[in-house]
């Protein structure tokens, strides 16, 4: 740690500029007129709200209302949590939508009957996907959030790792939906039942993917991760109940073109969701291990 005492406004400005020249993101706190140039130059200029001068407040981007430095760390923590939750929503939504699109495209090019009807796709997109996706907006801060280094300046939200995740999970969704649909048709099930199983498989995979995506920087195989939050379990319970209703309630069966799914086939659908979770969690742990070894 380097300490500079009794520095002039010019020295403060040079320190900020020198750190930025090394590619660092610089935060500067100050309360006086002599701090204004450095506050203006810093990436995050923070002026004292109670004891700070008007010049410092005008030059800074942020004003610390309570003059408590602990509030800076709390603000960084909150900002990282919001950013992480936005990234989680995107990481969860895009593979789901891409998997649905790929299912339809592959079926059309192969000249097959659609594994999921248009009404069922609307149900998945407008009801289950939105309901489950909303839970990620209320996710608490992950344990290692404040121990992570800051993001690189200018780093895009859609990174290469996220792009790979979208492609990888979309392919698994495609395989799961087509796999269960092919299984049902090979057993001589009516096409309505095969489509019902395909739709429920898609929703079950969404649920297991939700539990996976809640921890994008660490393992999902912990008690805290499995326990989830009230919001997560409320949305999962709501979606599960809705799926049972449209699958087994006769009036809605006519609307959505569904048929009751036999018990053992329902177990198979859940097993596909478990398999999805196991595969993507294993891939994440391998990727994180390789990433940690990268700088060595």
Predicted regions: what they are:
Residues 117, 165-166, 232, 265-269:
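Residue-level signature of transmembrane alpha-helical entry/exit and packing/kink sites
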Residues 1-34, 40-44, 80, 86, ...:
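Cytosolic catalytic headpiece
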Residues 1-28, 47-218:
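Membrane-embedded transport module
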Residues 38-40, 57-58:
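Structural signature of FAD isoalloxazine-binding scaffolds in flavoprotein oxidoreductases
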Residues 176-178, 238-254:
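Hydrophobic alpha-helical transmembrane segments in multi-pass integral membrane proteins
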Residues 222-230:
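Cytoplasmic-side transmembrane-helix entry/capping segments in multi-pass membrane proteins
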Residues 142-149, 220-223, 286-296:
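Short, Lys/Arg-enriched, Gly/Pro-containing loop segments at transmembrane-helix junctions
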Residues 124-128, 201-209, 239-246, 272-280:
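Alpha-helical transmembrane segments of multi-pass membrane proteins
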């Amino acid at each position: 740690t380097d300490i500079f005492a009794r520095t002039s406004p010019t020295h403060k400005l040079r320190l900020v500029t020198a750190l930025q020249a090394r590619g660092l993101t610089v935060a500067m706190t100050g309360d006086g007129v002599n701090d204004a140039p450095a506050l203006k130059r810093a990436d995050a200029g923070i002026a004292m709200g109670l004891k700070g001068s008007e010049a410092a407040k005008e030059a800074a981007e942020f004003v610390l209302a309570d003059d408590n430095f602990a509030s800076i760390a709390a603000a960084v923590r909150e900002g990282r949590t919001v950013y992480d939750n936005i990234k989680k929503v995107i990481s969860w939504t895009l593979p789901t939508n891409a998997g649905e699109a790929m299912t339809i495209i592959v079926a059309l090019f192969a000249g097959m009957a659609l594994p999921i009807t248009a009404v069922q796709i609307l149900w998945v997109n407008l009801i289950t996907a939105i309901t489950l996706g909303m839970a990620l907006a209320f996710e608490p801060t992950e344990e290692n959030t404040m121990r992570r280094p800051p993001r690189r300046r200018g780093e895009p939200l859609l990174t290469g790792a996220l792009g790979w995740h979208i492609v990888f999970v979309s392919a698994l969704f495609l395989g799961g939906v087509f796999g269960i649909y092919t299984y049902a048709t090979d057993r001589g099930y009516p096409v309505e039942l095969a489509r019902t199983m395909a739709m429920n498989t898609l929703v079950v995979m969404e649920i297991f993917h939700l539990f996976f995506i809640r921890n994008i920087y660490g393992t999902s195989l912990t008690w805290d991760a499995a326990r989830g939050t009230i919001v997560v379990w409320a949305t999962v319970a709501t979606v599960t109940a809705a799926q049972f209703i449209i699958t087994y309630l006769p009036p809605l069966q006519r609307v959505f073109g569904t048929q009751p799914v036999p018990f053992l086939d329902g177990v198979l659908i859940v097993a596909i969701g478990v398999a999805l979770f196991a595969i993507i969690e294993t891939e994440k742990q391998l990727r994180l291990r390789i990433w940690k070894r990268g700088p060595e």
